[in-house]
């Protein structure tokens, strides 16, 4: 197989791994932690996962010292935490 073919195969495998539904992967343990705004005084829009509703919810993140249940975007939150319906 040529090097171009190997690169294409590697790219397809990487894409497949990224697009694998969350149901076939374990949810990140931080997703079950309560939301924590952090201790700094910044006002950064962020998202946290709410297990009781299986949704990502927007909140204001202070910018530091929070737990892992905060994400820069709704998309990142859903990719890490949300269960498929």
Swiss-Prot record:
Signal peptide span: 1-24
Keyword flag Disulfide bond: yes
Keywords for this protein: Disulfide bond, Ion channel impairing toxin, Neurotoxin, Potassium channel impairing toxin, Presynaptic neurotoxin, Secreted, Signal, Toxin, Voltage-gated potassium channel impairing toxin
Residue pairs linked by disulfide bridges in the UniProt entry: 31-81, 40-64, 56-77
This protein's name: Kunitz-type serine protease inhibitor homolog beta-bungarotoxin BF B2 chain
Subcellular location field: Secreted
Expressing tissues: Expressed by the venom gland.
UniProt family annotation: Belongs to the venom Kunitz-type family.
């Amino acid at each position: 197989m040529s090097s171009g073919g190997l690169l294409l195969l590697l790219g397809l495998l990487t894409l497949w791994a990224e697009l694998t539904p969350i149901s076939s992967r374990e949810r990140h343990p931080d997703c079950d932690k309560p939301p924590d705004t952090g201790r700094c005084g910044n006002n950064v829009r962020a998202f946290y996962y709410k297990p009781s509703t299986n949704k990502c919810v927007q909140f204001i993140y202070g910018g530091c010292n929070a737990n892992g249940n905060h994400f820069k975007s709704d998309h990142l939150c859903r990719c890490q935490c949300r269960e498929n319906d």
